[in-house]
Amino acid sequence: MIVRGREVVGTSPHLYVSLFSSPQSCIVLLFLTSFFPQTVMSALRVALLEVERKFCSLAVKDLASNSGQPAFKNIRALAQKTIHDVYYDNSSGSLISAGIWVRQRNGSWEAKVKRGGDYTNSMFEELAGTEPVRRCVMDVIGKEGCEKDHFGLGTIADLSTVRQSWIADNEFKIVFDTMDFGHTVGEVELQEEVQFTATENLSIEQRKREKMKEMNKRIEMFMDRYSWAFHLGVPKGKLSAYFELHPIGKKQ
């Protein structure tokens, strides 16, 4: 299960927070971005939530043919795209040891900072942009670095992903990724933009979690209904698969 959200609060700078919760290789990811003007009350939260559940592979060769029973209400293919990820750490593995994964995705700097949990149920804070990543790296390794020299880090993983995508039943996004080293993994995603306000009994974070659970349940029902389309199995993340081929003794 993956959750991405864009949260709006006053005039504060960009903030990305990630929550990973992955029973049966499900991941929850929440991205928060602040952009409302000063006049907006701080109690208002607008979140773009995306819930994603992984699967091992597609069970049919041509998903768009919609040949299973019951058939999708409708399905359309999206343009294929390529994602290039380069992951970094220092020679001592300080970032990974601290639960931080720094990468360039299609040339843009990102960092995932682990905030708790374990391999199957983890929480991460997601940072995006050169300056937030630079500060994150500096806080761990204790010295200044510049983007030109990759903040003093070396490459630990370099991989490309070809992503095929479809939209089914007008709202569920199905993606299937093929990495350049042969590993494959799929995801079903559901995205909604939701406005949250705190209530007497529930905080905004509690309301988000309740919404995430509801969205995840809808994905479970979707995948159960169209089980002919998916080989569920036990999905393996792309970095876990990559490091099996190029061991550094770590998993995402």
List PLM regions with ranges.
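Phosphate-end processing signature that detects enzymes handling 5′-triphosphorylated RNA
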Residues: 36-252
